[in-house]
Structures are given as structure tokens and as C-alpha cells.
Design a protein with these regions (language model features):
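Compositionally biased amphipathic helical and low-complexity segments enriched in hydrophobic
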Residues: 12-14, 535, 653, 661
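Short hydrophobic membrane-inserting alpha-helices and related fusion/pore-forming segments
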Residues: 57, 638-663
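Non-catalytic all-alpha helical scaffold/repeat segments
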Residues: 183-646, 665-672, 676, 690-740
Length: 751
């Protein structure tokens, strides 16, 4: 309950002072009892050497236990009394400080008599401009009234802040006292704590468990309270561990399965929305709990993994433990060791389940076996969940880049998850049967993409501030990705619907290496040609030129990855032009950027030609869309402050996940703000929508696409006053570079 202005203004703390004095006396008495128990009771008893002989009950042992228990109770009583006294003292001191803060503020504000504050905390002016009839209608009257109102809002806002602080102090103290007093009517609370914050956390954890025990019988208001508790404490290690261990591993799974989000029919309206929030907050809370290496949490982890292969409650129409746990793993950051153990168990289970030719779809969605019942009827083994646990697991890897890099560094894991034609033992990804929370689309390949992004960039997917850490392990995983997804025989990007955006962002993160590697297609010595300096790349990180060429072609084929890579290439080219400003290398960087754009656009045009007939409305529409990739903005994040983190520009794409591109720093110096502005200006100028234009030929596509691609160098030439024949010569060279790029990815001229 919120504390009112009048309550704080007139707060009398004398009763609280008396309570503190009384509890201090209790502490003294409990200390005397606790101190005297050992020397006056336990030690004399032990020294007496009393033993029991004969066949009767061991009276001596029973007495010894009672003496020991009494000592434990005395110790618990002292601990509880100290905790209560400390909580009361902290609360009294905080309330006194906030009351003084209020009185001082009111006195300062009311000085001069112009401002009046009522017992309800309402602020008025004693001589308000608004009440003066002579001023009404005069010039500036409206502005004066508005200024008064702003001052009133400011004062009332400060008072509300003070009252909010007091309410939080009161609530925290109440929760701490409830926890410290405990519910045991026959003993003392041995876990009592004098820390108000810690006691409140423990009370909240107990309350969350109490609500969870109601399961699906929780009302919407109780479910809202449960969600709020988890949201408040989801990053609190102690709360999370206490909640998880008191629920137990299997208990956690049974609770979430029983809440009914995936029931058929599915919940609707407010209940569905609340349950989706529960899934997110519970997953995040459990993720924090797994970071603990205590024995209790290790038992929890072992229980969850052990329950993974089996249907809950031995009911074959219920989901398997892996399905339930992985559903929660879509949110939160899980411990690396737990993810490794969980993933090994999940893959082992899947391989065992499919070794005789059964499919994962049947395993996770269930199936009906006709005519196999005892009465000759069908056996229905379907379950309402129908979710693929590997999808949730992949999202969990995506949120922990160390774990994802380790997972995909294992070739067996890589092959199993990625698959591809000719790859033995690869996983056959099933579609979710009931993806109520994802617009009816399978989440498997989308989640796989998130895990791969994390593994190759060294940054958690969805991080508030994406970073770029391309160490040896991350680069090795990216090399495998390029080889597998660039293989034209496998056509993985076409087959794995939902992964193309992740592939585009991964390509963007290695845009410097891709530029450098493709420059070596002519087998020339790239170092002698100065390509390292041109791109800010290192020869030691070079990808095989043909691998880079094939990967860029596959990225260019897809509309989504083509758009992301086009944005990334333009931003990267602009950064390299800026890095070489005032030298001939600036134009060389621009020409190479046009070459890369030409390669991407040729691949996209060919794919459109394969899918649509030239001249058809759909053909024209696809050309227009691909020629009109948009960009919302860019921010520059400078690496170097954190060991191993590279300088990178974070590209903020509209209605999509941001992506990062590498920017080389000269001698460790920070990227200049001007570089970020230059990239941002180039991207904003390319923000256009050509879908309304009649692009009905490949020439029209080339014209529009080239116009976007050259924005950075056009800005550069404008700022340097390059005009006339010199400008014409530069433009001719840029067009020629774009054409050369087209030849890099030209395969069958499906244009």
C-alpha cells in the first residue's frame, strides 16, 4: 500500500523506537542463553560420559540429541532476534531520513509564501496568475499560466519520488519481517537475515513458489503477481536459485507443462498473453539459476536432463521433458556447462530415437497408430505441444556465445545441426505443429541461425550492445559455415527457410574478410597489391577466394540476405573511403565496393530470373524491391576498451535485428565520430523506395542498384569538388567495377 503525504508528514516513529529497544533487549537475553548453553549444558553433559546399556531404547543418545537440538534452537533464536532488530533499525533510519527530506524540501519550496502544499500533497500558488482577472487576456498570459503549471508539476513530482521511496522502504521492511518471523510455530528461523534486501528476496522467492504450487489454478491476478516477482528478480542469483531448487528439476517441468500454454485448444486473450509473459520470465529466471554450481542446483540440472527423454507423468499424450525445458530456454542466459550437458543428452536421445527409421516429427508431434489397440482400435500418441526442443536449445546457445562457439566447433555437432546433401547422420528438422507464439511458422532454422550468429561473432544474439569478437574459434566456425552454405550443390539457404537473415548478418560481420578474399580470385599477390591496407583485413584471416565467392553468391540470391549484405557493403565501403581520404586509395576502395555490389546484385537478378518470367508483374516487383533496400541509421561502437573486442559499426535496420560490420582502427586509436556520421549520411541518402517505379528490365535494376551502391563515393566527390571530365572518368571506372562484380557471380545468365 502506498504511503500518503499526510502519513509521512506526521509520521511518529516513537513506537518503532520502543520496538527496537525491546528487540535489542531480546538480543541480549538470547546471546546470554546461547553463550551459556555450551559451557553450562552441553559440555557438562558430554563430560559425564552417560551411556545406555541393555536392549531398551538408547536414552543417553536421545538426551544427547535433545541437548544438541536445544543449542541449535538457541543459536537460531539469537540469529532471528538480531535479524528482526536490524531490519527494524534500518527501516526506522530510512523513514526518518525520508521524512526529513520531505520536510526540508517543503520548507525550501514554501519559503516566501508563494507556494502552498496541502495535507494531500497538492501544490497551489497563493497568488496564481490564472486567478488574476486583470491579467487574463493580456499578452503572455498563457505562457505565464503554463510556467506556473510546470513549476507545480515539478514540485509534485519530487514529492511523489519521496513517497515512492518511503513506500519501497515500508514494503521491503514488511517483506523482510515476514520472512524472518517465518511460518514455523514450533521453532525459530535459522535462515533469518538482517539484510532487508536479502530477506525480501527470500520472501519473494517463497511467495513465487507458493503461487507456482497452485499451477493452472492461479487466477489471472495471481499469475500477474507471479510474473512480476520473476521479472523483478530474474537476474538475481539468490532468488533464482532458491526458486528453482524449491521447485525441483522435475517440478519445474511439471509446473510449466501444466500451465497450458500449448494446450489444444490454446488459451486466448489475457490468459494467453500472461502465459507468454510467464514463459519468458520463468525461462530467464531459470537461466540465472543455472549459473550456480551449488550441489542443489547440480541436482536440479541432473534431474532436468534425466527427465528429458520421457513423457511427463508417464502420459504418452504429454510432451517430453526436453520439449518443456527447451520451451523455457528461448529466454534467458543459461550456464555454458549446463548447455553442453543438456545438448549432448538431447542429441544422444534424438539419434537413439531415430536409429530405426522413425522421424523426429513422430517423436515430438506424436502419431496415431491405426488398429493397434487391444480392442482393435487406434492408439493415439499425439500431444498438444508439438514443439521441437532443438529450436529452444538453439536459442539458448544464441544467448550464450561462449557455449555456441564451443558447440559448433565440434564437427559432429556442426554436421548434425547443419545437415546438407551427403552429410551422414544429419538432423531432419521437424516443423512445430502448434507454434502459437510465432505466427504459424516453424522456428527451427530461425533459431539455428541465431546460434550460428552468436558462435561466429562472439556476441550474444539480441544483445543490447552487439560486439564483434572474431577469435580463432569463431573464425573456424565461420569458415565451416561459408563452406557449407556456399556450396551450390547443397542449396541450404533455399531449403532452410528462416535462416537467411542470420546468414546475411554473419556475412556482414566478416565483410572485410570477404572483400579481401574475393580480391584474390585472380590468384595475384594481395599483399603486394596493398589489399590488407585497402580493406583493413589481415592475410592470415583470409578465406579461400572460391569459398568467399560462392558464399557471396548464395547471400546475393536471397532477398533478405541480399538486402543486409548490400547495406553492410555500402557502410563498409564508406568507412574505407573515409580511412583513405585524400589519397588515390579512396577511389580504389570505392571501385572495389562497386565490384562487391555488382556481385551481390548479379546473384539476386539471376535468382529472380529463375523464379519469375521476365516482363511479368511479379518479376518487375521483385526487381524493384531488390533495387530499393532501405536503411534506418547507424551508430558506431568503438572496440578496444574491452580486451578482444573489435571496433565495429552497428547498423540499425528497420524492423529487424541490428548487425555489426568491422572497422579497422589505426594503431589502436578510436574510430572518429565523423566516420559514424559519414556512414549514417550515406545510408540515409540511400533511403528511398523505388517500388513505385516501373522497373521492368535488368537495365533498370542495374541503374537503381548502382545508384544506391555509389552513394558513399558520390558524397565524397561532392565534398571534394570533383566535377567535369575528372568526375566522368571516375564514374566510368565505377561502372566498370560494378560490371566486373557481376561476372564474379554470373553463373547461367538467368537474367
Amino acid at each position: 500500500m502506498s504511503i500518503t503525504y499526510a502519513q509521512l508528514d506526521h509520521l511518529n516513529l516513537s513506537r518503532l523506537d520502543h520496538a527496537i529497544t525491546a528487540w535489542r533487549a531480546v538480543v541480549r537475553k538470547m546471546r546470554e542463553i546461547d553463550d551459556s548453553h555450551g559451557p553450562k549444558a552441553q559440555k557438562p553433559f558430554e563430560a559425564a560420559g552417560w551411556t545406555t546399556t541393555g536392549a531398551g531404547p538408547d536414552t543417553a543418545a536421545m538426551a544427547h540429541k535433545q541437548i544438541k537440538d536445544a543449542g541449535h534452537e538457541a543459536d537460531s533464536a539469537l540469529k532471528q532476534a538480531r535479524a528482526i532488530e536490524k531490519v527494524l533499525t534500518e527501516a526506522r533510519d530510512s523513514l526518518k531520513a525520508q521524512q526529513k527530506r520531505l520536510h526540508d524540501y517543503v520548507q525550501e519550496t514554501s519559503a516566501g509564501g508563494k507556494v502552498r502544499i496541502s495535507n494531500q500533497g497538492t501544490v497551489t500558488f497563493t497568488d496564481s496568475v490564472a486567478d488574476d482577472p486583470e491579467l487574463q487576456g493580456q499578452p503572455g498570459f498563457g505562457q505565464a499560466v503554463a510556467a506556473e503549471q510546470r513549476r507545480i508539476d515539478e514540485i509534485e513530482g519530487e514529492i511523489r519520488k519521496i513517497l515512492q521511496t518511503v513506500t519501497e522502504v515500508d514494503d521491503s521492511a514488511a517483506a523482510a519481517l515476514r520472512y524472518n518471523v517465518g511460518n514455523d510455530k514450533h521453532g525459530f528461523n535459522e535462515h533469518a537475515t538482517g539484510s532487508t534486501e536479502k530477506a525480501e528476496d527470500r520472501y519473494d522467492a517463497a511467495r513465487a513458489v507458493q503461487l507456482a504450487q497452485k499451477g493452472e489454478d492461479m487466477s489471472n491476478s495471481e499469475l500477474k503477481e507471479f510474473n512480476s516477482l520473476l521479472k523483478e528478480h530474474k537476474k538475481d542469483p539468490e532468488f533464482s536459485e532458491r526458486f528453482a531448487t524449491r521447485m525441483g528439476g522435475r517440478g519445474t517441468l511439471e509446473f510449466w507443462e501444466g500451465m497450458g500454454l500449448h494446450d489444444e485448444p490454446a488459451p486466448e486473450g489475457a490468459r494467453k498473453e500472461l502465459l507468454e509473459q510467464t514463459r519468458s520470465q520463468l525461462g530467464a529466471t531459470i537461466g540465472t539459476a543455472t549459473q550456480s554450481d551449488s550441489k542443489a542446483m547440480q541436482d536440479w540440472k541432473n534431474d532436468v536432463i534425466a527427465a528429458g527423454p520421457y513423457a511427463l507423468d508417464h502420459d504418452l499424450n504429454k510432451p517430453r521433458g526436453f520439449q518443456v525445458m527447451s520451451d523455457l530456454m528461448n529466454s534467458g542466459r543459461y550456464d555454458s556447462a549446463f548447455l553442453k550437458d543438456y545438448g549432448n543428452a538431447l542429441i544422444s536421445y534424438e539419434k537413439d530415437a531415430t536409429k530405426n527409421g522413425d522421424s523426429l516429427s513422430d517423436e515430438y508431434l506424436g502419431k496415431v497408430i491405426p488398429g493397434s489397440g487391444l480392442d482393435g482400435g487406434d492408439i493415439d500418441l499425439t500431444n498438444d505441444w508439438g514443439t521441437d526442443p532443438m529450436a529452444g536449445y538453439m536459442n539458448a546457445l544464441g544467448h550464450n556465445h561462449e557455449a555456441s562457439t564451443e558447440f559448433f566447433s565440434n564437427k559432429s555437432n556442426f554436421d548434425y545441426a547443419m545437415g546438407g546433401e551427403g552429410v551422414k547422420g544429419a538432423r531432419d528438422w521437424p516443423e512445430d505443429a502448434y507454434p502459437q507464439y510465432d505466427s504459424g511458422k516453424s522456428r527451427g532454422y530461425d533459431a539455428l541461425g541465431h546460434a550460428l550468429e552468436s558462435a561466429t561473432t562472439g556476441s550474444d544474439y539480441g544483445a543490447a550492445k552487439p560486439e564483434l569478437h572474431r577469435g580463432e574459434d569463431e573464425r573456424a566456425v565461420m569458415q565451416r559455415v561459408m563452406e557449407r552454405y556456399g556450396n551450390p550443390e547443397m542449396e541450404l539457404m533455399d531449403k532452410q527457410t528462416g535462416i537467411s537473415d542470420s546468414m546475411g548478418r554473419m556475412g556482414a560481420a566478416y565483410i572485410d574478410d570477404l572483400n579481401y578474399s574475393i580480391s584474390g580470385l585472380d590468384a595475384s599477390d594481395q599483399r603486394q597489391r596493398g589489399m590488407e591496407e585497402l580493406f583493413g583485413a589481415k592475410d592470415e584471416n583470409r578465406i579461400e577466394p572460391v569459398t568467399a565467392q560462392q558464399f557471396v553468391r548464395e547471400l546475393g540470391n536471397d532477398e533478405t540476405s541480399h538486402g543486409i549484405m548490400s547495406q553492410a557493403q555500402q557502410a563498409f565501403t564508406t568507412s574505407r573511403i573515409q580511412a583513405h581520404e585524400g589519397t588515390a586509395e579512396a577511389y580504389r576502395a570505392a571501385e572495389w565496393g562497386m565490384t562487391m555490389h555488382g556481385a551481390l546484385d548479379e546473384a539476386r537478378a539471376e535468382q529472380i530470373g529463375r523464379e519469375y518470367r521476365e516482363g511479368d508483374e511479379d518479376y518487375n516487383h521483385e526487381l524493384a524491391k531488390s533495387a530499393a533496400w532501405k536503411q534506418a541509421g547507424v551508430s558506431v561502437a568503438v572496440g578496444g576498451a574491452t580486451t578482444g573486442v573489435e571496433a565495429a559499426a552497428t547498423i540499425l535496420a528497420p524492423q529487424a535485428a541490428p548487425f555489426v560490420i568491422p572497422i579497422a582502427e589505426a594503431a589502436g586509436t578510436a574510430v572518429e565520430t565523423g566516420l559514424g556520421n559519414e556512414i549514417a549520411d550515406s545510408l540515409k541518402e540511400s533511403e528511398r523506395d523505388s517500388t513505385g517505379k516501373a522497373i521492368n528490365s535488368i537495365d533498370g535494376f542495374d541503374y537503381e542498384a548502382k545508384g544506391l551502391a555509389r552513394t558513399g563515393i558520390d558524397n565524397y566527390m561532392n565534398s571534394h569538388g570533383v566535377e567535369g571530365p575528372s568526375r566522368d572518368a571516375r564514374n566510368t571506372a565505377l561502372d566498370a567495377a560494378y560490371a566486373r562484380g557481376g561476372r564474379i557471380t554470373d553463373t547461367d545468365n538467368s537474367r
